[in-house]
UniProtKB/Swiss-Prot annotation:
Family: Belongs to the SPC24 family.
Function as written in the Swiss-Prot or TrEMBL entry: Acts as a component of the essential kinetochore-associated NDC80 complex, which is required for chromosome segregation and spindle checkpoint activity. Required for kinetochore integrity and the organization of stable microtubule binding sites in the outer plate of the kinetochore. The NDC80 complex synergistically enhances the affinity of the SKA1 complex for microtubules and may allow the NDC80 complex to track depolymerizing microtubules.
Entry coiled-coil feature ranges: 46-134
Native source species: Xenopus tropicalis (Western clawed frog)
Stated name of the protein: Kinetochore protein spc24
Keywords: Cell cycle, Cell division, Centromere, Chromosome, Coiled coil, Kinetochore, Mitosis, Nucleus
Length: 199
């Protein structure tokens, strides 16, 4: 999709040059400028969507990691308690077989703990499924965006700032643009100027 947008940008630029050289009518120039503006808006929308996708991905990853930590902690506590109850049950059986009421109570609690352990195992499987379906697709899109632009974006900066580092040249180049002080066209042209045209 980005290749098509770059091709469209090049086509629009060529049309503008043709109009300027051939003194064509103002209508043709306006049409070309309108197309360029629409394309710039589309590119900025694409960047916004990619940024949101990465933020969503990070939120999902954090949530899954926390769920796994909580689940593991609960599992360890449950496993420890289960072992303790099993030992107590064995001691009761060995000491006095007549204490059936106590044994039944412990057996019931043991069954409940086993059910809890099964529920925890189900939760772990669900967390694994979330990890294998949601995260890889988000990672793929983020890597694709990075591979095309060679830009590492700073998603923790102020929303009005566009910050990152461009690694496309021989030397890494920092990017810091205040969107309140520059137009969308300027920002887009500047970012395009960083990208290599060698394909």
């Amino acid at each position: 999709m980005l290749c098509e947008q770059i091709k469209e940008y090049v086509d629009v630029s060529r049309e503008i040059v043709k109009v300027m050289v051939s003194d064509s009518a103002a209508v043709a120039l306006k049409k070309s400028l309108d197309r360029q503006e629409a394309m710039i808006d589309l590119l900025l929308d694409t960047e916004t969507e990619a940024s949101q996708l990465i933020r969503d991905f990070m939120a999902v990853e954090e949530k899954v990691a926390q769920t796994l930590l909580d689940t593991e902690e609960t599992k360890q506590k449950t496993s420890s308690k289960l072992q303790k109850i099993e030992r107590e049950l064995q001691e009761k059986i060995e000491k006095n077989s007549s204490l059936e009421s106590g044994i039944k109570f412990l057996q019931k609690e043991l069954e409940e703990l086993k059910m809890m352990e099964e529920e925890i195992a189900d939760m772990e499987r669900e967390a694994d499924e979330d990890t294998t379906t949601v995260i890889p697709s988000a990672v793929y899109l983020a890597k694709l965006f990075h591979n095309v632009t060679k830009i590492d974006w700073d998603y923790n900066c102020d929303p009005s700032l566009i910050k990152g580092i461009h690694y496309g040249g021989e030397i890494a180049q920092p990017i810091s643009i205040d969107s309140n002080q520059h137009s969308k066209i300027f920002i887009c042209n500047y970012l395009w100027s960083l990208l290599s045209t060698d394909w």
